[in-house]
Regions:
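Pan-zinc metallopeptidase signature
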Residues: 115-191
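Peri-catalytic and regulatory segments of divalent metal-dependent proteins
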Residues: 1-41, 48, 52-60, 79-80
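An active-site-proximal "capping" alpha-helix that borders the catalytic cofactor pocket
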Residues: 61-80
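Flexible coil/linker segments and helix-coil junctions enriched in charged and small residues
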Residues: 22-28, 84-86, 113-117
Length: 191
């Protein structure tokens, strides 16, 4: 078994960011590169989550895509920044992933129809949650992992207060759930 990350996908991530921000006066190529890396890193961990579920035959409830999203968010939240001595790098990575989902939703729901004259119909039946739902979920997990650091997400209304109330518990349950599921697997993740 193997994980495959397609060059076309990676290219789409970078092109998508450039589509939204490439003409900005303060466009920063390093921010662009970091964004692309962070989204690709997230997708890698998302696929690792699928692999763990498959290889170790982990019992899950709910959509596997959501569970894999949760695993990826958890792994990013554990990213330690040795320069600052904190986990703020992981928070930035999660913000970039949230931005990616937000922009994907914006493109398909508003920009694509305006540019093509074709109506976009969300795939409500798909195994993936809608991009806008994934945006709010990722934002919630970021907030829940460190509410004090991420209070600005609520203050700027990127995360509604009604959702933020339960985010710390949601994050705890994700962390606890994955620790439990992988507890019998000698992988070193939760040692």
């Amino acid at each position: 078994k193997q994980l495959v990350m397609c060059y076309e996908f990676i290219d789409d991530v970078f092109e998508g960011y450039y589509y939204f921000y490439g003409e900005d006066e303060d466009f920063d190529e390093q921010v662009w590169a970091d964004y692309g890396y962070n989204v690709v890193d997230y997708v890698f961990w998302h696929e690792v989550g699928h692999a763990f579920i498959d290889i170790y035959e982990l019992p899950i409830t709910g959509l596997e895509e959501d569970v894999a999203d949760q695993f990826a968010a958890l792994m990013l939240s554990y990213t330690y920044d040795s320069e600052t001595g904190s986990y703020t790098l992981g928070q930035t990575m999660l913000y970039d992933v949230g931005t990616w989902y937000y922009n994907e939703n914006l493109y398909w729901s508003e920009i694509y129809p305006a540019e093509t004259g074709e109506e976009y119909v969300p795939l409500y039946w798909d195994v993936h949650s809608l991009d806008i739902q994934r945006f709010y979920n990722i934002t919630c997990y970021a907030y829940g992992s460190d509410p004090e650091y991420n209070q600005h997400l609520v203050n700027t209304e990127d995360l509604p207060e009604d959702r933020a109330i339960d985010c710390e518990y949601e994050y705890f349950m994700i962390e606890y759930g994955w620790e439990y599921l992988l507890g019998g697997v000698d992988n070193g993740f939760f040692d």
